Each structure stands twice: as C-alpha cells, then as structure tokens.
Amino acid sequence: MADLCVRAPAKINLHLEVLGLRPDGFHELAMVMQSIDLADRLWLRPSADGQISLRCDQPELPTDGTNLIVRAAELLRARSGLVELGAELVLEKRIPIGAGLAGGSSNGAAALVGLNALWGLGFRAEALQAMAAELGSDMPFCLDGGTQFCFGRGERLEPLELQAPLKLALLLVKHPQVSVSTPWAYGRCQALRGDFYLQTEGEFEQRRQALRQGPLSQSLLRGLVQSTPLPPLRNDLQAVVEAEVESVRQGLALLRQAQPPLVEQPLAVAMSGSGPSLFALFPSLERAQAAHAALADELEQGGFGAWCCSFSSRGVSLER
C-alpha cells in the first residue's frame, strides 16, 4: 500500500474560561477554539513486523510511548483486535513544541485518522472521537477543527453557527527556548482563583449558556465575522502565565505595539491556551504579514519566532 499523509493543524483559543473543578480532578472549561493553517504532516506506511515506530525531523521531540502519536496508534490497534497491525510513522514538525497550540493533540488525532485509513479499519467518526477523548482533552477538537465551542475538559464540541468560514489571519509569536507546563498553569490558576470557582453543574451550564448566547459572545462573533475590532479576548490562564514568564510579557507588549501609522492596529492580542504562544488577529493575511515586517527587528532582538497564519475551517485531514 502506498504511503498516506495526514495534515495536522494547530489551534488557538479565542476564549478560555476556567469555570471550576470537576469530580474527576480536571478543570471544567468554556472555550472557543479555532483551527489555523500552521500544520504538521504525519506520513504513514504499514510495517510487516507488527511494530509501531515513530521518527521526527525534530530530535528534541520524544518518539517513544509517551508521544500521543504512538499512544493513539496503540489504542486504535487494541480497539481493532488486530494485534498484528504495524506502521512506520514519520512526523514533519512545523508547529512549535510546548506552545499552547495543541500540536501534540493534533498529531495524535492525525494518527487516529491516518491509521484508520491505512489499516482499513472503518471506524466511524463517533468512535474516533471517543478514542480521542480518552487520549487528550484537545484531541476531539483537533479531529473536527474549524470554529467551535468546547466544554467539559475541552472534549464536548458545539460548532458555532456561521454562514461561512471565518477569514481572519494572525501573527503568531513564541520564544523558542520557553515552554509552559499546562498542569502548572492550571494549578497556579486554582491557587489564585480557586475561591471564585463555580461549584455545581447548574452553575457551569449557566456560564456555558452565557458563552453561547450572551452579549460578550455575540460581540465576539460579530467582530470575527465582520473583521472589526473585538472585545478583549478572555483567557483565564493569561494573567497567571504573564505574571511568571518574562517572554510572555515581552511578546504581548511587542504585539500591542502594532499601531497606526506604523501598521494597522490588530483586532485583538492574546495568549493561546496555557502559552507561551501569543497572537495578534488581523482582517487578512496581508495585514498580518505587514505587521510582521514592521515588528521584525524587535521580534528578532527579543529572540521570538514568528509565523503568519490564516484561520482554517477543518481539522486533521488526509492529503494522500
């Protein structure tokens, strides 16, 4: 069988609200997540020896059983009952590692989709979603992608009602030497804000409904659709991380410097997920590129990597 290739896009958070703690110890979240066209590619081919092996073009990325690609492959094989199945997997890594962009989750979702096709298993989308939820909170979104409300741990998806896919773009920045532990960020959030956490499912649902239909979400949706300035993007982890991570403070300050007459003011500036990736939203890719050019010297002096990306309407997808 010929090689297969799966495209695995990154995501950003347009809204991240920490509601409280769940009985299972995870945080209950209310989010809006958005796929972007910065993507990894996962190449797959069957192996005759029944082994699952993974290689990556970035040697710092673990390729053992801790990698979500390997974990997804092993779970899919176990659920198939065909223990003789094997695969050689090669990851072309373009999404920054440890960046709050769900790169690892998207890679795991790509493995589920790619191996389901490569091995001819025929699992339906609902079954793949259930397996994705077992493996990681962001992975169900990475399967579907687009623009979605994400509730629970992030695994409960509700697509936003859009007449057409959003056409916005962004300037994304991250310091390559900095990463943020997601458990640390949530733990710190709990330490600082735990007294204000909601306690009951009824309270959680009130906040979900406010996000679905409240004035702030309607203002956010209107700005996204019309490419007009947005209300401040809420990320309850941003203040926690910004207080402790110097590069996040510096990066946010740099992105906020994108002002007339130097360049068009961004529609919004925020941190994605638990960071440390930061982004500024613009109405078009050309305007994001203009902002990048205007800030290039300062970004280089600060040691930041930068990418100009567009919103994407889909999650992981077979390319061949």
Predicted regions mapped to residue ranges:
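Residue-level signal for inorganic ion chemistry
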Residues: 14, 42-44, 69, 104, ...
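Short beta-strand segments
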Residues: 7, 90-92, 143, 151, ...
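Contiguous, small/hydrophobic- and glycine-enriched helical/loop subdomains that border
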Residues: 85-86, 108, 112-149, 153-156
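Glycine/serine-rich anion-binding loops at beta->alpha junctions
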Residues: 62, 90-119, 137, 268-282
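Solvent-exposed alpha-helices and their adjacent loops that cap or buttress functional pockets
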Residues: 35, 81, 133-134, 140-143, ...
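ATP-binding N-lobe of GHMP and related small-molecule kinases
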Residues: 1-99, 117, 121-126, 178, ...
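Conserved, helical-rich catalytic subdomain that frames metal- and/or nucleotide-binding sites
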Residues: 144, 153-268, 283-286, 293-296, ...
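Short beta-strand-to-loop capping motifs
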Residues: 18, 46, 174-175, 280-284
